[in-house]
């Protein structure tokens, strides 16, 4: 029977080791074997279970409720992400920034960055992106909390093994989304730094020798696609984000 370390499982299942530990310790979802030195070892059944947990979470089930669903073999797929958005919105409206930070941190420990970005943070930010001053203020608070939290996550990830990369926004206007994409990349094994300002004219030769992860927004233009491919054909170490 094949056995895998937590790092190997993280790569196989595309999930942060911190999240795997939280699923085990806090929620009892996983029961890995242990080496004599106390290191976790997972088998193929554990990997299947992790993927099943991810499926439930992607459908909006709170982590605390997944264990019951796993034991019941239920095929129901509820979508609870709207409820999670409302909880986050409540914290924003309460102006209790300490509680808001703690809630975001807990979600970050319980869920993969990609899942949170796709199902929670991006949809709620879209709801807040309007001309109403009150909602604009809430969006500003949320963005500040997110960037601060992500910066801490990236700093922690840089202490681990991985390949260094610089995240760059090319002709974008949503800087917070750039940080979210960098956070997702950091959970895929990259050690990330973020160029804080978007570049309207992107010249990769200015970053010679660096691996560049480029975010062009949700709707990458054909010209951008062709230019990125041309740079890669020239040997530039450039990778598009979010595609």
From Swiss-Prot:
DNA-binding region, residues: 6-25
Any one biological process term the GO annotation gives: regulation of DNA-templated transcription
Keywords for the protein's UniProt record, in alphabetical order: Activator, DNA-binding, Transcription, Transcription regulation
Entries under SMART domains matching the protein: HTH_MERR
GO molecular function: DNA binding; DNA-binding transcription factor activity
Gene3D superfamilies: 1.10.1660.10
Entry-linked InterPro entries: DNA-bd_dom_put_sf, MerR-type_HTH_dom, MerR_fam, MlrA-like_C, MlrA-like_helical, MlrA-like_HTH
Limits of the HTH merR-type domain: 3-72
Keyword Nucleus: no
PANTHER family for this protein: HTH-TYPE TRANSCRIPTIONAL REGULATOR MLRA-RELATED, REDOX-CYCLING DRUG-SENSING TRANSCRIPTIONAL ACTIVATOR SOXR
Function as written in the Swiss-Prot or TrEMBL entry: Transcriptional activator of csgD, which is required for production of the curli (AgF).
The protein, known as: HTH-type transcriptional regulator MlrA
Organism of derivation: Salmonella typhimurium (strain LT2 / SGSC1412 / ATCC 700720)
Gene: mlrA
């Amino acid at each position: 029977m094949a056995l895998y370390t937590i790092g190997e499982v993280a790569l196989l299942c595309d999930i942060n080791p911190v999240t795997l530990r939280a699923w085990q310790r806090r929620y009892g979802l996983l029961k890995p074997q242990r080496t004599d030195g106390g290191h976790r070892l997972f088998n193929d059944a554990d990997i299947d279970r992790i993927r099943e947990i991810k499926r439930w979470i992607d459908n909006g089930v709170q982590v605390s409720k997944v264990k019951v669903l796993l034991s019941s073999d239920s095929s129901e797929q509820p979508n609870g992400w709207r409820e999670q958005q409302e909880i986050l919105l409540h914290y924003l409206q309460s102006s209790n920034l300490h509680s808001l930070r703690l809630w975001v941190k807990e979600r970050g420990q319980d869920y993969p960055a990609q899942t949170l970005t796709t199902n929670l943070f991006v949809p709620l930010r879209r709801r807040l992106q309007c001309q109403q001053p009150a909602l604009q203020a809430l969006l500003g608070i949320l963005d500040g909390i997110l960037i601060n939290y992500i910066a801490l996550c990236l700093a922690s990830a840089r202490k681990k093994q991985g390949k260094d990369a610089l995240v760059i926004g090319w002709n974008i206007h949503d800087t917070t989304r750039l940080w979210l994409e960098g956070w997702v990349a950091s959970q895929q094994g990259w050690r990330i730094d973020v160029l804080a300002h978007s570049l309207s004219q992107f010249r990769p030769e200015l970053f010679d020798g660096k691996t560049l992860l480029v975010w062009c927004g949700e709707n990458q233009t054909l010209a951008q696609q062709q230019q990125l491919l041309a740079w890669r054909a020239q040997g530039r170490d450039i990778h598009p984000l979010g595609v």
